[in-house]
């Protein structure tokens, strides 16, 4: 008998930084309130930029404080609030790169969300850099993510593509067993929900959920598509070292994907430990 449990809920107040674990949350149309509500703008190259272009962001962590303010911790342990007047200078110094921190702006402010200048004039080379793919490895199918070619995130959000990303403990365990020299720690993959699945022998159970509805607590999610992984999964984060072999294993063992994207079709409260049903 298939049994699915919501094991962990994670929120990431600042795009590309480590986040915080939640016991419960009220899911809205845009997913978890406060998730990816801040992002950094590259003041050297232009555009909102995450760790694909500024890898050191993944060494920082953030948690939500009062009133939606983000408390950011640098790798050296120092703290700064998103509302502090010196936040941009502080972040730029710690990142060793000029940036500014931005809250979400209205969706019609398209220039704010438009991608900055590419690092390469060769479009395929740029994509291979973003997705960490070698010349002999296939690029991911981006047909379901048309906005990502023009915008860093869907305008009005700082998500990569959809409000929620889900993964299973089984997928991480599968990759760990097949590639024991790399650490497939959930912190590399920044899922909002991590599920534990019992009663399935699927290597990557969540891939079978695409096109179906997931009922958890009072909420209902529509599982939209797989999550193609990018170079961020190879960067150092917390106590995990930089490891480009993570992408080699992902491509070989899982077509470069891990986890699935979801939309909220019914808003409601969810709690860690709840049993989940798939329709």
What would you call each of these model-derived segments?
Residues 1-279:
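Metal-cofactor-dependent catalytic cores
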């Amino acid at each position: 008998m298939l049994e699915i449990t919501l094991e962990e809920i994670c929120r990431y107040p600042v795009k590309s930084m480590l986040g915080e674990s939640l016991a419960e949350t009220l899911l809205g149309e845009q997913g978890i309130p406060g998730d990816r509500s801040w992002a950094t703008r590259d003041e050297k190259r232009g555009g909102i930029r995450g760790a694909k272009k500024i890898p050191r962001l993944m060494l920082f962590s953030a948690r939500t404080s009062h009133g939606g303010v983000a408390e950011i911790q640098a790798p050296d342990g120092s703290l700064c609030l998103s509302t502090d007047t010196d936040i941009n200078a502080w972040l730029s110094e710690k990142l060793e790169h000029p940036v500014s921190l931005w809250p979400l702006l209205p969706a019609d402010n398209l220039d704010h969300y438009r991608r900055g200048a590419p690092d390469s004039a060769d479009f395929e080379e740029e994509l291979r850099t973003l997705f960490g793919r070698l010349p002999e490895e296939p690029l991911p199918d981006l047909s379901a993510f048309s906005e990502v070619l023009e915008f860093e995130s869907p305008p009005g959000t700082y998500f990569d593509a959809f409000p929620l990303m889900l993964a299973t403990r089984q997928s991480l365990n599968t990759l760990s067993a097949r590639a024991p020299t790399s650490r497939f720690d959930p912190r590399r993959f920044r899922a909002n929900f991590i599920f534990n699945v019992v009663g399935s022998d699927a290597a990557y159970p969540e891939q079978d959920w695409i096109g179906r509805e997931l009922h958890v607590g009072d909420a209902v999610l529509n599982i939209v598509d797989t999550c193609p992984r990018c170079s961020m999964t190879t960067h150092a984060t917390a106590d995990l070292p930089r490891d480009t072999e993570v992408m080699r294993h992902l491509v070989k063992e899982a077509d470069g994907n891990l986890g699935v994207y979801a939309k909220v079709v019914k808003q409601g409260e969810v709690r860690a430990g709840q049993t989940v049903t798939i329709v």
